[in-house]
């Protein structure tokens, strides 16, 4: 077994105090996202999306956040993917943003609701054409005999859609994750990290400080 117990560092970039918290967690998330982008982090919108299968086995994957507002967090995916199939059976999910270099993380619990076709199409039309074509090519999570099969299909579809717009695949969609709780974690000196949990109760958010 590889021993990693000596790998550690101090967290010194700041603190988080109750008096500084807005009542709406989305305002704090917007501030932190802006600061993560300003800090030029690699992929600040990358989040871990966790789902579970019918046996309670959890699965995780990195997905890009594409939009957020007071209603929740939006991402897009192939509707034939493992994540989409699991969401169809159990729409309770968790999201996690690991912003290591600024010593912050955000953890979200909520329910994923499918977006309308109009909402999906609106975003799909903003994607680069090659990305639109790639959405047609990959049967996400299915087994492939070789990469060449995928590449061959890509160039086949690229020729097919060489002229005009690429239509929206019927098997491609998106989700709005409506949060029931959002936890903000700020690294602190001596492992005395700051953690605040926002929990939705009816139309309000209750804020609790958690022990690190």
Curated annotation (Swiss-Prot):
Its cofactor is FMN. GO terms for molecular function: FMN binding; pyridoxamine phosphate oxidase activity. This is Pyridoxine/pyridoxamine 5'-phosphate oxidase. It catalyses: pyridoxamine 5'-phosphate + O2 + H2O = pyridoxal 5'-phosphate + H2O2 + NH4(+); pyridoxine 5'-phosphate + O2 = pyridoxal 5'-phosphate + H2O2. It holds the Pfam family PNPOx_N. Homodimer. Substrate binds at residues 8-11, 66, 123, 127, 131, 191-193. It comes from Shewanella sp. (strain MR-7). Binds 1 FMN per subunit. Its EC number is 1.4.3.5. FMN binds at residues 61-66, 76-77, 82-83, 105, 140-141, 185, 195.
């Amino acid at each position: 077994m590889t021993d990693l117990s000596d790998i550690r560092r101090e967290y010194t970039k700041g603190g988080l105090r109750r008096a500084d918290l807005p009542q709406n967690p989305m305002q704090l998330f917007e501030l932190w996202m802006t600061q993560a982008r300003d800090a030029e982090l690699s992929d600040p919108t990358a989040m871990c999306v966790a789902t579970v299968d019918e046996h309670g086995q959890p699965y995780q994957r990195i997905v890009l956040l594409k939009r957020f507002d007071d209603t929740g967090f939006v991402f897009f995916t192939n509707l034939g993917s493992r994540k989409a199939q699991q969401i169809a059976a159990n729409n309770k999910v968790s999201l996690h943003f690991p912003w290591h270099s600024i010593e912050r993380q955000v953890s979200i619990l909520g329910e994923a609701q499918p977006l309308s076709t109009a909402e999906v199409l609106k975003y799909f039309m903003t994607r680069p054409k090659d990305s639109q074509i790639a959405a047609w090519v990959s049967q996400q999570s299915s087994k492939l005999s070789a990469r060449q099969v995928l590449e061959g299909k890509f160039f086949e579809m690229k020729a097919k859609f060489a002229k005009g717009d690429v239509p929206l695949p019927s098997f491609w969609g998106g989700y709005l994750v409506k949060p029931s709780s959002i936890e903000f974690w700020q690294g602190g000196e001596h492992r005395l990290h700051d953690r605040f949990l926002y929990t939705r109760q009816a139309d309000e958010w209750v804020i609790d400080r958690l022990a690190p």
